[in-house]
UniProtKB/Swiss-Prot annotation:
GO cellular component, one term: cytoplasm
Binding site for ATP: 40-43, 82, 86, 195, 198
Top-level EC class: transferase
Recorded catalytic activity of this chain's protein: UMP + ATP = UDP + ADP
Gene Ontology biological-process annotations: 'de novo' CTP biosynthetic process; UDP biosynthetic process
Family according to the record: Belongs to the UMP kinase family.
EC id: 2.7.4.22
Name of the protein described by the UniProt record: Uridylate kinase
Region (Disordered) location: 1-29
Keywords: ATP-binding, Cytoplasm, Kinase, Nucleotide-binding, Pyrimidine biosynthesis, Transferase
Amino acid sequence: MTESREPHVAGSAAPRPEPANGLASGQPSSRARYSRVLLKLGGEMFGGGQVGLDPDVVAQVARQIAEVVRGGVQVAVVIGGGNFFRGAQLQQRGMERTRSDYMGMLGTVMNSLALQDFLEKEGIVTRVQTAITMGQVAEPYLPLRAVRHLEKGRVVIFGAGMGLPYFSTDTTAAQRALEIGAEVVLMAKAVDGVFSADPRQYPEAELITAISHREVIDRGLRVADATAFSLCMDNGMPILVFNLLTNGNIARAVGGEKIGTLVTT
């Protein structure tokens, strides 16, 4: 029986030819330490410190991702929505938390579509899957289909968080990484890694190059929410926290170079 064609999503960019070389179809280069990764991007960085999108930042991130995909690494992405909305902050201003969280989820979809556009400008075939059905712009979240896309050398971007209020996109990244069989969560930040204290308030704070999930939780180090770290700890999923603003750091992280902070069980 011939394989059925995947439906074209209305409103998305015209499909581009699939990569023809072996590396781009999912066979990692010898320089890559990891073959399948989940990249977590903070929404605030997409705004360049402002509300909305900074196209220059999104383009730079897309170029970094394209570099590792061309090397054969399978890349899935979860993006926050903090450049548009933060549910917890809106709640503090009097908005009902559930509704404000859903607004935040819509912000992550806007970021996902923007990244998809810039990745496809780089020639990288990309799919967006959302936890809330949005058939005009994205596929529904289906882990088996996501894995199939990755095996074909496509980037998969997961939007709308978990589709549930009270869950952060950090927790979404941990859950999606486990479900698609990623080897590591690459947590991209605007700082060099995990520090002994907030380096913006304490210039003498020291970078921690290696630490356990348990110690991060026990010391209350504010890198990601405790639920995400607990989920990774319980399932042996390593997290690499690194600075996205240093050009080429995604490739360095995938290649196993000693950058940032490696969090292991």
